[in-house]
Each structure stands twice: as C-alpha cells, then as structure tokens.
C-alpha cells in the first residue's frame, strides 16, 4: 500500500487531485493537505489572499510546514500541487531530510510570468515536473514534461454553438473576492434585466460552500439568483458569464462560453504584484491564446476575451463587454484553444507516479 504525502492547498488543485485519484489503484493512501479523509489539514485553512494576509497567518503556515516535513517520513513519495510559496520550500526541506525521497510537482508555478529562478529550484529538489501548459516545458532543463491539461479530463460538457439560456455569475471562491466583485455583478444583472427583460441568473457557488450560510457570505442580494454548485454544467447552459479571475475563466473558454474576466485586489497587493509580474493579461485563456498565436504568453497583442482589472472594473465595463463581444469569433477561437491543450493529464500523472514508486 503506497503512502503519498500530498500538498494541495488550492480548491482547483483538489478538483484535479480527485480526478487523478480515479486513475490510481484503490490501495494508494494519501496523507497531508487535501480535501478528504485522513488529511492533516483542509485546504480551507490555507484560504489566504494577499501579502498582508500571509503575514497575519505566518505562525500557522510555519507550523503546518514543520508538520508536513515530519509527515514525509511516513510517505513513499511526495506529490506537490501548485502553491509554490509553500511547496517549493517544502520540497527543499523534505529532500534535505531524505535525499532518496521521490518528489513530484504537478501544476507547476508560473515561472514564465515571474520568479524564473524557481525553475532551477524545482529541478534541484524534484524528480518529476508535470507541466500542464505546452509552452512552460521550455523554461526547464530536463525534468519537465507536458502531461496534458487536467480540465480536459474534468469537463464533460462542450458547446457546439454559442446559444445559451442563462447568465452565469462566478464572483470567486474567497470571501475577499466575493465582497469586492459580487456587488458589481448584482448591479450589472439588474441593469441587464431592465434593458433586455428577465433572463435566468445563475450564481455558481464553490462546492465546499455547501452547508454554509450563503446569505452571510453573499448578502441579501443572493435571493436574486438561482444557486448552482456545478460550474461546468452552468457554463455549458449559459449565454454569457461574468467571472472572477481564476481557473473558472479557462473552464469557460474550453467549454465555449463567452465571458468577461473581472478582478479587483487590495490596492497595496495590486501595486506589489505589478512590480513583480510583467504581464498584459492575467486570464489563463488569454495567456494560452498568446502562446497559441506564437506570442509571448501574457504579453501578446491577441486577446480571446475582455479583462476588467482593478480600477478598470466597473458595472459599465461589465455591460459593455456583454454587449460588444464578438461571440462568433470567440467561439471559433475557443475551439482552437481546446485543440492546443490536446488532452487531459490524470492518466499520464498516474503512470509517472507508478514509475517513481517502482511499480512499473
């Protein structure tokens, strides 16, 4: 019975992890940080957004780090997913503790956007690097392989045309995102109803919010929306979507749903990020679309969908994006993007795990 130490701090990483587990033998035992039984911590305990939030939770993060290093002694191999600020130092400490411990990094940090030096650290401390973006392999020397993209395993609904019956609203999975973006979505939805008549409005809520007081999280205006916990099905049925920056924007692009990306951070966090990261776009679909068109990812001139970031985000901007988007062009180009990513990744990662465990 192989024991795998998992560090999956993000909600999206845990969705990818669940798909991966379906491709692994049933006797694999998981320990560490993930959504499920026998976890040391739930990913919800790591729901941190912004530089000041990290400082406020530093004591907890250091404690969790130390516990994970100790827990690694029980593991046959280590699986790290995303969250590089936590996971790269973790890989370093585990490798120092046991140089023979096999470490896989799946969902690599975005070294193509900032902190390119992390690529050397990953190759030094990890044994296999599972890249989910075709272009990011070029930033590594030898240990990175393109394994496909996990969303192509997980998405079961793909549009055949741009028709849809609903408007979908996805204001994020963090309380701070919801507080900043949901009120703008509410106002846009109300104006659209005044201008175009009633359309079904669907609010997609993260599945891990089930059982929580949604009115306390979203406010009284949540009553204006139908509630869905199934993002993919809701996007498939939608005419258009309003989405907070994150994995959901790429999901919409792959499904074929026209959308606008909305994002607003704390002013200080945004200014720090602008100093560290040199990108024109923050949406994954736009970044991939640049690469697809042989442009520098995130810095190209081509754009698949509109982005409204920081002070550019407004109700007027959301309405303009809805009204002016060339949906026929968008749909055609979204099909190209799906072809570019080629295939899912779960089976390939499962095979590589078996190889590292000497089970093949």
UniProtKB/Swiss-Prot annotation:
Stated EC number for the protein is 2.4.1.182
Q: Which gene encodes it?
A: lpxB
Q: Which parts pass through the membrane? A: none
Q: In which pathway does it act?
A: Bacterial outer membrane biogenesis; LPS lipid A biosynthesis
> Lineage of the source organism?
Bacteria, Pseudomonadati, Campylobacterota, Epsilonproteobacteria, Campylobacterales
> Which GO terms of type biological process are on file?
lipid A biosynthetic process
UniProt keywords (A-Z) are: Glycosyltransferase, Lipid A biosynthesis, Lipid biosynthesis, Lipid metabolism, Transferase
> In its UniProt entry, what is this protein called?
Lipid-A-disaccharide synthase
The terms describing its cellular component in GO are:
membrane
**What does this protein do, in the record's words?**
Condensation of UDP-2,3-diacylglucosamine and 2,3-diacylglucosamine-1-phosphate to form lipid A disaccharide, a precursor of lipid A, a phosphorylated glycolipid that anchors the lipopolysaccharide to the outer membrane of the cell.
MF annotations from Gene Ontology: lipid-A-disaccharide synthase activity; phospholipid binding
InterPro entries found in the cross-reference section: Glyco_trans_19
Catalytic activity reported: a lipid X + a UDP-2-N,3-O-bis[(3R)-3-hydroxyacyl]-alpha-D-glucosamine = a lipid A disaccharide + UDP + H(+)
| The family this protein is said to belong to | Belongs to the LpxB family.
């Amino acid at each position: 019975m192989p024991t795998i130490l998992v560090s999956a701090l993000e909600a999206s990483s845990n969705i990818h992890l669940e798909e991966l587990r379906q491709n692994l033998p049933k006797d694999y035992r998981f320990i560490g940080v993930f959504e499920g039984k026998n976890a040391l911590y739930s990913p919800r305990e790591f729901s941190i957004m912004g530089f000041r939030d990290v400082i406020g939770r530093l004591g907890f993060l250091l404690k969790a780090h130390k516990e994970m290093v100790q827990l690694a002694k029980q593991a046959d191999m280590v699986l790290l997913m995303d969250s590089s600020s936590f996971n790269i130092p973790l890989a370093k400490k585990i490798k120092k503790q046991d140089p023979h411990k096999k470490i896989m990094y799946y969902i690599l940090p975005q070294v193509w956007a900032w902190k390119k030096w992390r690529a050397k650290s990953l190759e030094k401390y990890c044994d296999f690097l599972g890249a989910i973006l075709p272009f990011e392999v070029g930033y590594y020397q030898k240990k990175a392989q393109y394994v496909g993209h996990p969303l192509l395993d997980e998405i079961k609904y793909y549009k055949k045309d741009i028709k849809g019956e609903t408007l979908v609203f996805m204001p994020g999975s963090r309380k701070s995102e919801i507080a900043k973006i949901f009120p703008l979505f509410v106002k846009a939805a109300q104006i659209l109803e005044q201008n175009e008549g009633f359309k079904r409005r669907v609010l997609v809520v993260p599945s891990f919010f089930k059982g929580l007081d949604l009115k306390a999280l979203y406010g009284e205006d949540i009553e204006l929306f139908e509630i869905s916990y199934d993002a993919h099905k809701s996007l498939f049925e939608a005419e258009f979507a309003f989405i907070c920056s994150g994995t959901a924007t790429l999901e919409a692009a792959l499904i074929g749903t026209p959308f606008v990306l909305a994002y607003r951070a704390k002013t200080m966090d945004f200014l720090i990020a602008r100093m560290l990261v040199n990108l024109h776009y923050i949406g994954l679909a736009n970044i991939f679309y640049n690469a697809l068109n042989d442009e520098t990812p995130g810095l190209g001139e081509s754009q698949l969908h509109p982005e409204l970031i920081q002070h550019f985000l407004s109700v007027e901007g959301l309405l303009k994006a809805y009204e002016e988007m060339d949906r026929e062009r968008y749909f055609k180009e979204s099909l190209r993007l799906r072809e570019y990513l080629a295939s899912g990744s779960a089976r390939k990662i499962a095979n590589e795990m078996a190889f590292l465990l000497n089970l093949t």
